[in-house]
């Protein structure tokens, strides 16, 4: 009956109330308590500073619908936050950091487009629009958002900073990259960007730019082009099968397939080019390719789950082993902490989907490396057992989403020993009881005579914290770069902000 009433309360909340953010300025004078706000589940939470809320959103949002909010709402919140922050250089650097270090695309495209009206008069604006571009299609996506939301399509006006920055950004790309990201099937094509910004050709891209402008640029080297050519030239099914096998084999042996494309096409390679599986596995575990790929750790978990569905023959087993090894390589910088550590994972209803996948993966990684205690919580909290000698994926499998409410109080009511640090993986929406767990946290500290570091890891970027900011290190993001920041946190409380501010724009 209690759970039914709680669910009814949430439904009433969604119908009757709009989202309210009460943001506090970053680095204000410390007071006895932070500003209380209401989180998206209707419970109490502490508001983040505007800067921290922005960074959290940038590092966690893939601009898709979440349990408590839609992708369009996220973009509106992003615009509002960027306008509230007076330090525009920090906003710009945060966008670059999220795109370059964490591989976040759509959310940074939206922010870059919104900043066109906020960077007037800043000499470093052109440098921002250069540095926020990592791939050629970053420019087409930013322009697409800009045309849809920030200018009159019939008479579009493009800021000089954007045009100069994009023109310079073309210097990063060679003929292959330009031909790969022509975006010829999109409303905004790469040739449109060229015609708007007029980049100066270099030896790396002169031929491709010339062919692109004259609509003669063809890309025959990508995996899509190779497979398409096989389909067009095959005379029968047997011929098609051989041509596809040859195409995959050539792409893999010549290393002309991107790492992410390789990861996404492992199922096709197993089915269509079994002779190339061994070479594909060698690419998968190549340490240099993994580091350059910018593939987020949860992508390995997704690939592992998909391949696991294919059965148990040798090719499948070999690929699963390679994915496991690649995941381990991608996380060599996971910190080993001194003392006792508790990893706490939210398995409540709001964590369904990607947040749950991320929490279980990163929880397993931290647990394996640190041999620490693990707890899951929803309506209540419970300790979980695991074997640290198992693989990350095996450990992860035991930390599954279960649904239910989000009772943060239960964590510290259940904690039964002194911990030096607590790592909390959650979407930070604590509605059970409608109060923050600050009292329970204080009681825990008093009971065990301890003042632990608390790493509050926001997996959804909803904008509220379950503890006052000064009592925790607020983390966000899905990249293994978060672990680099964690290494600094116990020394430098503002490590994340320092990383962002260190980016050079002028």
Identify the residue ranges that each predicted region occupies.
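Intrinsically disordered, low-complexity segments enriched in serine/proline and basic residues
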Residues: 2-12
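Aromatic (phenylalanine/tyrosine) cluster motif
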Residues: 13-14, 21
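Long lumenal/extracellular ectodomains of secretory and single-pass membrane proteins
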Residues: 23-354, 368-506
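Short, conserved loop/turn and helix-capping segments at secondary-structure boundaries
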Residues: 356-360
């Amino acid at each position: 009956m209690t759970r039914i009433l709680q669910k009814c309360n949430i439904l009433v909340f969604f119908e009757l109330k709009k989202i309210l953010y009460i943001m506090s300025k970053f680095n204000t004078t410390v007071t006895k308590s932070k500003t209380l706000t209401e989180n998206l589940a209707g419970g109490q939470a502490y508001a983040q500073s505007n800067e921290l809320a922005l960074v959290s959103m940038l590092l966690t949002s893939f601009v898709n619908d979440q349990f408590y909010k839609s992708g369009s709402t996220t973009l509106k919140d992003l615009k509002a936050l960027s306008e509230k922050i007076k330090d525009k250089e920090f906003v710009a650097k945060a966008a670059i950091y999220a795109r370059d270090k964490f591989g976040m695309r759509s959310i940074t495209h939206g922010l870059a487009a919104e900043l066109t009206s906020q960077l007037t008069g800043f000499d470093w604006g052109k440098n921002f629009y250069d540095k926020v571009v990592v791939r050629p299609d970053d420019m087409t996506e930013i322009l697409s958002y800009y045309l849809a939301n920030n200018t009159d399509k019939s008479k579009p006006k493009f800021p000089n900073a954007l045009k100069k920055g994009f023109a310079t950004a073309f210097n990063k790309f060679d003929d292959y990259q330009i031909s790969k990201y022509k975006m010829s099937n999109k409303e905004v094509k790469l040739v449109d960007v060229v015609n708007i910004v007029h980049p100066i050709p270099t030896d790396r891209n002169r031929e491709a730019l010339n062919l692109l402008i004259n609509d003669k640029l063809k890309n025959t080297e990508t995996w899509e082009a190779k497979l398409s050519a096989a389909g067009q030239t095959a005379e029968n099914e047997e011929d098609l099968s051989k041509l596809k096998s040859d195409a995959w084999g050539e792409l893999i042996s010549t290393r002309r397939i991107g790492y992410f494309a390789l990861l996404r096409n492992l199922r096709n390679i197993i089915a269509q080019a079994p002779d190339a599986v061994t070479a594909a596995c060698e690419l998968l575990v190549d340490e240099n390719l993994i580091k350059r790929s910018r593939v987020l750790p949860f992508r390995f978990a997704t690939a592992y789950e998909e391949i696991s569905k294919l059965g148990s023959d040798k090719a499948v087993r070999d690929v699963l082993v390679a994915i496991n090894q690649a995941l381990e390589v991608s996380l060599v910088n996971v910190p080993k902490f001194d003392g006792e550590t508790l990893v706490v994972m939210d398995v409540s209803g709001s964590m369904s989907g990607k947040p749950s996948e991320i929490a279980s993966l990163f929880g397993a990684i931290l647990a394996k490396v640190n041999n620490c205690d693990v707890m899951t919580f929803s309506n209540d909290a419970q300790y979980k057992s695991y074997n640290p000698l198992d693989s990350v994926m095996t450990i992860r499998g035991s930390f599954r989403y279960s649904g239910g409410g989000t009772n943060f109080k239960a964590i510290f009511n259940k904690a039964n020993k002194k911990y030096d640090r607590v790592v909390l993986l959650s979407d930070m929406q604590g509605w059970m009881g409608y109060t923050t767990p600050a009292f329970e946290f204080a009681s825990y500290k008093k009971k065990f005579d301890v003042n632990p570091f608390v790493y509050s890891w926001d997996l959804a970027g909803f904008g509220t914290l379950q503890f006052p900011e000064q009592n925790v290190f607020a983390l966000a993001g899905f990249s293994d770069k978060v672990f680099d920041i964690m290494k600094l946190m116990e020394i430098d409380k503002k490590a994340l902000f320092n990383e962002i501010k260190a980016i050079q724009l002028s």
